[in-house]
């Protein structure tokens, strides 16, 4: 059954320059209202970041689509997400690749995201409670790394876990944040500024 709210969102994303049909299809089929509180459900398909508790947010749909598209994912891509949050970005990735690894520093958010993903029959995701600055070394190296919080500097551990030819999308900065796309070429990392963004900070350590 068609969802007019989802239809409207996808039309907006297309008009905003999103071209990857796999990203559009993934976001069209996912019930975004399942990833926000009941009080926020009426805004679920608006192009806004929404609070999810613990000082964190679910990113605006355009940014989710843009960051996912920039990774140029293949079905077999080994993907690491830093910042599980609500699980929405995780779910979008899981529609496109065979398996997603996701690290969340706030235990309550990790468990809530796991519950949501299970309710939606999304099982090709492994989540971990831990420090996102450290990545998930035992599951790497990764073809793609997506970071959903802003780092003051690019975490060295994440660069080292990126496969040769792999791509990372990460917001960097404090008050002024730039969305960077980084591609590894041997021992070199080629960085491109995509656009200005605003994310919650990538905090070191983990929180029970």
Curated annotation (Swiss-Prot):
Its EC number is 2.1.1.77. One of its GO terms (molecular function) is protein-L-isoaspartate (D-aspartate) O-methyltransferase activity. The keyword Transferase applies. It is found in: Cytoplasm. One of its GO terms (cellular component) is cytoplasm. SUPFAM superfamilies: S-adenosyl-L-methionine-dependent methyltransferases. Keywords: Cytoplasm, Methyltransferase, S-adenosyl-L-methionine, Transferase. CDD domains: AdoMet_MTases (cd02440). It catalyses: [protein]-L-isoaspartate + S-adenosyl-L-methionine = [protein]-L-isoaspartate alpha-methyl ester + S-adenosyl-L-homocysteine. One of its GO terms (biological process) is methylation. It comes from the Bacteria. PROSITE patterns: PCMT (PS01279). The active site is at 59. It holds the Pfam family PCMT. The keyword Transferase applies. Catalyzes the methyl esterification of L-isoaspartyl residues in peptides and proteins that result from spontaneous decomposition of normal L-aspartyl and L-asparaginyl residues. It plays a role in the repair and/or degradation of damaged proteins. Belongs to the methyltransferase superfamily. L-isoaspartyl/D-aspartyl protein methyltransferase family. This is Protein-L-isoaspartate O-methyltransferase. It comes from Vibrio parahaemolyticus serotype O3:K6 (strain RIMD 2210633). The lineage of its organism: Bacteria, Pseudomonadati, Pseudomonadota, Gammaproteobacteria, Vibrionales.
């Amino acid at each position: 059954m068609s969802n007019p709210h989802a239809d409207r969102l996808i039309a907006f994303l297309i008009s905003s320059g999103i071209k990857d049909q796999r990203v559009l299809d993934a976001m069209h089929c996912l019930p975004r209202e399942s990833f926000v509180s009941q009080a926020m459900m009426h805004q679920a398909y608006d192009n806004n970041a929404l609070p999810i508790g613990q000082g964190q947010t679910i990113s605006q749909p355009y940014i989710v689509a843009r960051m996912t598209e920039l990774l140029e994912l293949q079905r077999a891509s080994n993907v690491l997400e830093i910042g599980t949050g609500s699980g929405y970005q995780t779910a979008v990735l899981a529609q496109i690749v065979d398996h997603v690894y996701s690290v969340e520093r706030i235990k309550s958010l990790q468990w809530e995201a796991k519950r949501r993903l299970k309710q939606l029959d999304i099982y090709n995701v492994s989540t971990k409670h831990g420090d996102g600055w450290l990545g998930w070394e035992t599951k790497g190296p990764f073809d793609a790394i997506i970071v959903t919080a802003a780092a003051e500097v690019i975490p060295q551990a994440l660069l080292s876990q990126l496969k040769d030819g792999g791509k990372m999308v990460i917001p960097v900065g404090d008050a002024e944040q730039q969305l960077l796309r980084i591609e590894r070429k041997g021992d070199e990392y080629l960085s491109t500024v995509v656009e200005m963004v605003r994310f919650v900070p990538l905090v070191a350590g983990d929180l029970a």
